[in-house]
Each structure stands twice: as C-alpha cells, then as structure tokens.
C-alpha cells in the first residue's frame, strides 16, 4: 500500500488531468472512456518523469559524473503506469482523484499492454536494473531495439504452441518519447578501400547500404528519489524511398531496401534456423550496437569535447553477448572517425567496457560464421580480425609461446567468431550472476582466460526490483509486513530481515497463512476470468514458470506428475494432499522438443481434468502467454517454487527470488542462485534434491547411460512408456526417446531424489505452522536479492560510479 504523506505532485496532476482530457479528446473526466483516461494519465506521468530525468542528468553532467550505458537485446519492461505511480508514491492520491470521477484505477491499469521487449530472465533483469539504478541515484541509460512486435503472443491450439504477433505499440507508444533529431545512419555491406597518406594507413568503407536508426526514449522511475533511468529504443527504417526506380516500374527493387531495413526492428529473436534468419539477427545486433555507441560518443562529445576521458566518464555494459559488436564499433569510431592510433583506441576501449556472462553451456555461447560477418559488416569484421591477431600475439608472448593454449583462447577459430571470448578479451571486468556460476566461469568456461587475467573476474549475484513484486503486486503481504516490522522495507530490502524474530509468533504465522489464502483466491479469480479454468485454492500451488528449455527440466516435473497420476489411477481412494501444478512458459519458435514438452503438459492437464475421481486431488494447469503482468498475479499466490535445473546449468535465475520474496518455499537443486537462497533463508526452509555440480561432472566422466535407469526403475519405466502409449490421445515419442537414449540434462539420474523431495515438501505443507515458519523465513531472507543491492555492487566494483 502507498504511504499516506501528501505528495506535492498531486496538485499538478489534479489540475492537468481534466485539462488534458479536454485538449486531447474534448471530454470531461466524467465523459472519458477508460482508454482515454489511461492515455492522459500516462502522458502526465511521462512528463513528470521527463522533467525529473532532465534535472537528474543536468546535475550529473555539471558535477562531471560518470554514467553507465547498459546494452541488452532484451528489456522485459512489462507495464509502466502502475510501477511509475507506485515509485512516485502517487497511488493513493491518484486513486482518490479518479474515485471522485467514479473511475477505477485498477481498471485503467488493464489498458496498458506489456512491453514485451524481452524473452525471459535476461530481459527482466535488465529492466529491474534500470529501476534499481534510478532508485539508488546512479545515472543510467539502457539501449535496445524498439521492436514493433517484441516477443510473440503464445496461443495453444490443441496444446501446440503457436506464435502470434504481439502488437504492443498502439497502447504502449504513449510511454515512448520520439527523438528524431538524434537519428544515426548505420552502414551495412559494401567494400573496404585501403590507402596510405603521410605514412598513415587508412581504411575507408564505401558502397555501403544505409539504415537509419531513430531513438525513442522510455523513462524508468526509481522509488522515492530524484533518479530516473532512460531506456533508449532504436527503430530502423530506410533513409529514403527511391521514387525514380519505383516510377520506372522496378517495384520490387525499390521496396527491397525498405523491407530489409524495416525487418531489423520488426520482432525480437527472429527464427535463425536458416541463413536469412541468421543474417537478420546479426543485422539487429550491429544495428543496436552502432546506434548505441554512436549516440554515447556524440553525447559525451557534447559535454566534454574530447574522447580522451571517455573511459573516465562512461561505462558501457554488455548484458550477455548480443551487444558484443559494440566493442569493434567503438574501435571503428576511434580509428576511422577520430584518427586515434590502434594502441590508444584499444586502451580507451578496454577501460570502457564490462561484460556479464549469463550461460555456462557451450552450445549457448554465441558464435558467428566469419563469412556472414564479413559480408554484413565488412569493416567490423576487419577490426575483429586485427583484434584477434594482436590478442593472440600477446598471449603467445605472455604464455611462453604455448600455441595450444593460444588456440583455445583465440577469438576466431574453426571459421567462427566467438563473441564471449571477444568480450573477455576487450572488457576490464567479466562477471557471473551467482557465486556458483562465477566459479564455474573461472574453473571451466573461461579457465584459460582466468589464469591469464584473474583480476578481471568478479561475481554480482542477480537482484530483482523487489518493490514491483511485493509492494505493488502483493498489497496484503505488504500490509502485514508494515504492521509487523514497519514500512522501511519498502525503501530498503535489508529491513525484511527484521521479520525473522517473528518466526515463532503464532499470531503472525496465522496472519501470514491467511494472506497466502487470500492471494490464492485472488489468483483463482484472475485465472477464471482469463482462461475459464477453476483452481482448487485448498490445494498446494506448485509453480514452475520460466522459459521452456530442456536444461530447466520441466519434463522432470512432468515425470513426477505422471508417477502421481499412475498411483492415483491404481489407488483412487488413497489419501493424497491435493496439489495443483502450475506451468507457464514460452518455447523458442524453432525449438521443436520444447514445444513437445508444452503439448505434453497440456495433454496431462486435459486427461486429468476429464477424470472426476482424480481431478479434485491432482490438477495440472498450463497458463498461456507468460508475461510480466501474469507473473505479478501469480507470485503472491505460489506455495512451492520449482527451481529444478541440472546443477551447473542455470547461471542464477530471478524467478526463484520473486517467489521467495512472496513466501514460496523453494524445491530445487544446488544450482544458480538457489545456493544463495539456501544460505539466506536457512537449510531448514528450503528443500534441496539432486546431484551437485561436481557429482554431475563425475557422472559424465564415468559415462552416463540413462537406458540402464529406465530398465531398472519401475516408476521411471512406466512414466516414459506412458509417453509412448499416449496421453490424452497424443504420443510423445521424441520426448521419451530423448530421456531414454540421451537424457542430456540427467532427468532420470535425479528423478528418485526429486520424487522424495516432493513427498517431503508435501509433509511440510501439511504441518501448517511449520510451513508458515518456512514461508516467513524465506520472506525475511529475500532482501539480499534486491536489484538495489546488485546495481550498487556493479557501480562500486565494476563501473566505478560515484
């Protein structure tokens, strides 16, 4: 709930609201539609944030402060109106103002589409960090692409995922402030010409194709301060339309350039199962990087008039490898546009960039074919080649001319450019996103690089914009916490630790259980309205919501459900604690096996739904089109948080933190941030199962043969055979074969441990006071996972912001 103090902004809003309705729509507040109210209210908030941002950045520049630029292909922003109103502490005032006109603020929120400019945790993390940077008062700007459609809308047709365009701009454009005067020309293809002049070697890029990048700014509010971040989103278009060619009848040729340019900012992550898709993704990456770096350099020059101090005033952060081409692009500007020597340019670059790695899986480390890069961005390719040549030469000299080690560390090998290796070579800091992940990076993924430059490697455990997931999304829990420990936790997540002293207070525990029940009832109403599915709120809400990928092991969850289902079919009258398994996930459009797993979850849910003897005890629900808004409704209602990736595969996770914050108990492996969640809440308040990372590596080294487990474990055998025989009339041979014959993420090896953990967590749940105590300790321990804490660590230890 919002604070009760008077907010000086409210007088201005009360005055502007009816005026803007009259000016834009010629209606009074009483006559206005909810959609008109949404647009006017949003525009007022944008104006407030814009003024705060200008004041904030003017102060930074006048003080000579350093700024961070956060480059990411994804920013999963969700809705802005509610978050901005809460962060500006205007919720009570605006709600009361609208009530005078008989307008319901909660209904107004529903008119805003999710800004789905991301796919999952990577994009949501970036969004949380812009919030955290604004809250903590660090000057920051994010850079990404203004995707016309963003991530797809998911629709299940007979359980099969289909992808529909996510047309977010009509409702979301009110949050975008166009800056056409800051447009930048981006050059693709073309030829390189080399020449010498007065003993200087010059390279000129000619005969290129131009795409114009136009920026749109989205303001990101922080809580309770003067800071405002900006997310600068770049839209692509052709520089002009060739009317002469069109009038001569060459329609296809005249339109082709427009089509190629427009495709760049059309959708997030186009399918890259074919060459055209790969080419488009590469164009997207360079487009974003060239626009961002060009804009950063221009802005810096406007303030300081020189690039000599760029690294002292600018930190550029690469969030995963998609923005890697920003490194050679800054080199290009320094060399070609500004005339720096290679050595001086490289010194500036290597003091400016920092890199966060988000994966330890070799297949997920981004690589690009050299011929594709050479064709699409020839000047950038030539710079990468020179970076690699000089880097390898320095490695040879440093490592006693160990050619094998140099080959392993080379940026270019096997006709591929290894983007993560380029990031490590060019960045002054390389960090993982959990303690385990950062250790794995040093031990295996970048072991040679770590030995070469150990001082570069750091850890910053992920954090979340916790106010969004608690203060904004869970008012009932916020009210209880405020009454129990005071309201300081809304500003400072560390204050949540004060709840720990109430772990044996039956009155507080009883109230906590009542809050959870209330939230489950509210979520059930939401699901009924959205999907016409009726949830049993007296059951355990067991939740696995995240991107659909084999390493996240949704199919391990499914295996256990199949085992429970088989047991209940044979023992329909047996005692069984009712449980509702809730899934929500999107699969990449070209990821066939992931789509099969989604269909299998749907098939199980349908078969159980049709069985009246079982469906009161066991329920499976797949919620379509997982997004930030759905997550905000679900997190407060969750009992069990499934974090079941194979140890050593999940970098960190952030859904685990949001669920923990709302009192869900983690059922998980010792992977990613689960280890730190365990440390924060206490061993007795989390349920851990499965192999550790060393045990996984040992089993791989010995030789893992899943078919042996299949042949010798009756429950596993039956579950996989059920996939072959059919569920709700559908067979899942590909999923079954993958588990039985390959099982790359060791589902079968961890199954017995997982099933025992499921039984134990059910026993804990049935002891109501014990469960409430476990829940309370999770909430009390969640403060460490605040984005405010994470960005402060980045600012102090990596970006060196004041």
Where are these regions (language model features)?
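A conserved ligand/cofactor-binding region detector
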Residues: 1-802
């Amino acid at each position: 709930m919002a604070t009760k103090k008077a907010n000086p902004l409210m007088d201005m809003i009360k005055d502007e609201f009816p005026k803007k309705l009259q000016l834009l729509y010629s209606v009074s507040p009483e006559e206005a539609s909810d959609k008109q109210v949404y647009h006017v209210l949003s525009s007022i908030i944008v104006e407030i944030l814009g003024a705060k941002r200008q004041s904030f950045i003017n102060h930074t520049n006048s003080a000579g402060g350093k700024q961070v630029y956060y480059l990411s292909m994804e920013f999963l922003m969700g809705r802005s109106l509610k978050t901005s109103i809460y962060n500006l502490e205007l919720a009570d005032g605006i709600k009361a103002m609208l009530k005078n006109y008989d307008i319901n603020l909660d209904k107004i929120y529903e008119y805003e589409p999710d800004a789905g400019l991301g796919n999952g945790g990577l994009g949501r993390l970036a969004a949380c960090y812009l919030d955290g940077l604004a809250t903590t008062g660090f000057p920051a700007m994010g850079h990404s692409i203004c995707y016309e459609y963003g991530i797809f809308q998911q629709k299940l047709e007979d359980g099969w995922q289909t992808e529909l365009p996510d047309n977010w701009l009509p409702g979301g454009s009110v949050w975008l402030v166009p800056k056409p005067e800051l447009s930048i020309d981006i050059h693709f293809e073309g030829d390189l010409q080399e020449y010498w002049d007065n003993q200087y070697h010059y390279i000129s890029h000619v005969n290129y194709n131009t795409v114009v990048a136009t920026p749109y700014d989205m303001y990101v509010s922080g809580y309770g301060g003067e800071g405002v971040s900006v997310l600068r989103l770049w839209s692509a278009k052709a520089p002009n339309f060739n009317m002469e060619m069109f009038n001569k009848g060459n329609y296809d040729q005249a339109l082709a350039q427009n089509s190629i340019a427009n495709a760049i900012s059309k959708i997030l992550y186009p399918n890259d199962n074919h060459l055209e898709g790969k080419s488009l993704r590469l164009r997207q990456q360079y487009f974003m990087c060239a626009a961002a770096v060009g804009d950063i350099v221009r802005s810096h020059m406007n303030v300081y008039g020189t690039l000599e101090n760029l690294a002292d005033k600018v930190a550029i952060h690469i969030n995963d490898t998609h923005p890697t081409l920003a490194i050679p692009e800054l080199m290009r500007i320094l060399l070609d546009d500004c005339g720096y020597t290679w050595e001086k340019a490289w010194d500036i670059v290597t003091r400016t960039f920092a890199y966060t790695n988000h994966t330890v899986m070799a297949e997920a480390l981004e690589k690009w074919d050299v011929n594709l890069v050479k064709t699409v961005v020839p000047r950038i390719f030539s710079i990468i080649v020179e970076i690699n040549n000089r880097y390898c030469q320095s490695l040879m000299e440093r490592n006693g001319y160990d050619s094998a080690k140099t080959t392993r560390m080379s940026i270019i090998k096997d006709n591929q450019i290894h983007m993560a290796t380029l990031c490590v070579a060019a960045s002054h800091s390389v960090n993982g996103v959990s303690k385990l992940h950062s250790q794995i990076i040093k031990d295996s993924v970048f072991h040679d690089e770590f030995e070469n430059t150990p001082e570069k490697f750091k850890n910053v455990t992920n954090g979340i914009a916790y106010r969004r997931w608690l203060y904004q999304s869970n008012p009932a829990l916020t009210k209880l916490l405020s009454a129990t420990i005071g309201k300081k936790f809304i500003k400072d997540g560390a204050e949540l630790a004060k709840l720990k002293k109430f772990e044996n207070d039956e009155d507080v525990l009883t109230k906590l259980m009542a809050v959870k029940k209330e939230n489950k009832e509210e979520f059930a109403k939401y699901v009924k309205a959205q999907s016409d599915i009726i949830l049993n709120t007296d059951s355990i809400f067991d939740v696995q919501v995240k991107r659909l990928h084999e390493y996240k092991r949704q199919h391990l969850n499914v295996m256990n459900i199949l085992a429970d289902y088989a047991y209940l079919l044979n023992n329909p009258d047996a005692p069984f604690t009712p449980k509702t398994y809730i899934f929500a996930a999107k699969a990449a459009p070209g990821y066939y096996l992931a789509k099969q797993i989604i269909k299998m979850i749907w098939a199980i849910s349908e078969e159980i739904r049709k069985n009246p003897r079982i469906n009161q005890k066991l329920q499976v629900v797949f919620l379509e089109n997982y997004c930030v808004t759905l997550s905000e409704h679900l997190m407060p209602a969750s009992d069990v948080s499934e974090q079941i990736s194979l140890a050593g595969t999940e970098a960190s996770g952030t859904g685990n933190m949001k669920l923990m914050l709302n009192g869900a108990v983690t059922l998980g492996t010792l992977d990613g941030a689960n280890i730190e969640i365990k440390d924060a809440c206490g061993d007795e308040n989390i349920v851990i199962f499965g192999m550790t990372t060393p045990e996984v590596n040992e089993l791989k080294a010995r030789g893992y043969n899943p078919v042996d487990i299949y042949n010798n474990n009756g429950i596993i055998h039956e579950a996989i055979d059920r996939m072959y025989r059919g569920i709700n009339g559908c067979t899942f041979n590909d999923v079954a074969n993958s588990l039985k014959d390959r099982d790359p993420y060791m589902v079968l090896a961890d199954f017995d441990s997982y099933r025992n953990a499921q039984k134990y967590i059910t026993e804990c749940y049935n002891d109501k006071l014990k469960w409430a105590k476990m829940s309370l300790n999770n909430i009390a321990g969640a403060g460490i996972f605040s984005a405010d804490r994470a960005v402060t660590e980045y600012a102090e230890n990596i970006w060196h912001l004041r």
